[in-house]
């Protein structure tokens, strides 16, 4: 999770931040994520997210259908104002033109943090 993501989560917990998770993005760069990330390194596409939650788990899902072939290496979750709250690196995932790609990101919230 990014620093901005942790700040957003703290603000949501106190009711001071009303922004919502809105989009999932995918990209082609495999550079390790950092807390200071503000964007995907090499964004391919971004689409609307579906968010569901139960007690301590938040599931974020999105579906992509790309017009050309890409190797997907990174995934990011964005708020409705475009703020990146988390970025993750994947094993190389080759997606052919017209092939669907479904992405799910799961946040687990516990006393020890967000995972």
What are these regions (language model features)?
Residues 1-73, 80-115:
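Small cysteine-rich, disulfide-bonded extracellular modules of the LU/uPAR three-finger superfamily
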